[in-house]
Amino acid sequence: MFTDSDAVFAGFCSGCIASANCALRRNHTSASLQAAITSFIHTVKYQPVVFALPPPIGSVMVEYTLVKQLLLLNLYSPASWPSFAVLLDGLMTANTTVIAAYVNGLLQSSGDSSTAADSGEALTGIKCSDVRPAGRATSLAGIRPVVEGRHRLSQMVGDAADYLPIECAQWRMPAREQYAGGFAGIRTRGRLLVIGNAFDPVTPLVAAQNVSKGFERSVLLKHLGYGVCSPFLPSFYPLRVVWNRIGADGSLQHSSLAQGSLCTARATRAYFVNGTLPEPGTECRVDVDRFAGNDGWDEVMSHFNTGNATATATRSVAHRVARRWEAGRHLVGMGPLESLVRTARLGVMDKL
């Protein structure tokens, strides 16, 4: 899962240094920026920071788990990287003006968050029902090797979602339709097109390669982009809330849509319209900068014939997908800072 996560984080840092649209780039190289962010995360692990923000926000606490989850969530979509860089710079420099402005913007745009409850059991039920008996355990010691294995895959985010394997280790309701067969030598009626992202924080390219190897005659197209989903959501939505909503309302999907690519779009259209596949080893570059602040799909889709009804419909769908993040502000629920604000008034910290 986290095989390429650190490479995506490195891409965030190198993209920041190369862009004028990154608040973190001043007086840094890519390596020094990585070191600075890592140092900040380690600092708040043992010394959480409390920020006293002006009314009506109040005091909020920034600690290790929050920052790790925010980092992982924002690696999902480069379209969020400029705004996340502003927020992260504000946190690292203790700039309460920047933090307050960000939180106020979030609170004003998130609407009535009380209507979007975090259905935490949904993710557990979906993922844990597919866990094989070998993934279950009766004690923390029994599941520790799995958790530690995830940590070894990624220094930056390997421990950002430890709750999931620990919860699944105790799950006692396996799905009836759980697949117990193999994934090799599968021959489908039609040949499959498999698309894998080169820099994906949670569904790495090696997984796409394994899928392609399992399906005979399939072709893997390597999408040379960062991230895993589009549209993006505001930086402070909690990781568990977002994961619980993936696929439920169409606002997030694991896909190759995080960065637009005319090459990938043409290959996908050729497959669905004509049944043709790209040549083995095909790689498609993306047509948007990592810190552009958008996913680039509007520009990509402008290359398709607007007079053709099918192309027009395709552009319409792509446009709605590219803009769905605005609706996502109202669909997903309160963000960590907003929940921190509410619970701080009660003297209780929200553990997300």
Task: For every predicted segment, state its role.
Residues 1-352:
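C-terminal subdomain of alpha/beta-hydrolase-fold enzymes, centered on the catalytic histidine
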